[in-house]
Amino acid sequence: MKKDFLEKIRKLNWVLSESTTGKLSYGELCRILSEIINANIYVIDRNGFVLGAAYTEASDTSTFEDELGFEKITDSDNLSLLEIEATSANVIGDDLMYMFGKSYKMTDKYHTFVPSICGGERLGTILLAKYHKPFDEEEIVLAEYGAAVVGLEIQRNDRIKKEHEQNLKTAVEMAFCTLSHSEKDALDKILRETKEDEGNIVASKIAAKYGLTNSVIVSALKKLESAGILETKSLGMKGTYIKILNPHVRSLI
């Protein structure tokens, strides 16, 4: 195996090792792939969001950004990508117009599409594009290796998000268990008066409106604040500012 090819693999391995510590940047991954393959690189997740991009020619940046909006491609374009179940290399001309429509402006570039699949689940797509000459076998192998890195990272991020959501739910449940029946009732009324995730309340008005005591309302707020569920700030005569930090608190009321 060529020495330079091994060096390119090592660069991608470096990105993967950084990922395990939570430091991966999709932009950095795209930059490295763009550098070693000499092509424009786009990492797109399964929902059509552009996670990262890198360009060999600055003039290409705005063109593709205009067409994709950079942050998200159209649903129809994303569907076309998801229909690609295996690496599709060196697509050009009419085949690109068939995929993305006649208005697509880069039909003169060679495109390679590499699905990112991990654990049998489709997680995204790496799109590569360049002028002048088609992608060779080595470049396609590197792109497929990059797609594996992307799949592992997306899967890791999904797992972290799920764990974070579960931790939020658990925190709310534990905090809820510390409330007395009257404090739970007070919390229900507070949330009714706070339609958004933040706002101002006047404890005395809520107490009078629902037949509660100020002390019960204050106690409920203090317990939830100490549990990290919300934060409060006294506004003096204007009442109390409340900001909900854990959105799952509403699900238990």
What residues fall within each predicted segment?
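Acidic surface patches and DE-rich sequence motifs
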Residues: 45, 118, 235
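Short coil/loop residues immediately preceding or within conserved phosphate-binding loops
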Residues: 38, 111, 239
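Structured interaction and signal-relay segments at domain junctions
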Residues: 2-14, 18-107
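Signal-transducing coiled-coil/dimerization helices and immediately adjacent hinge/linker segments
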Residues: 156-247
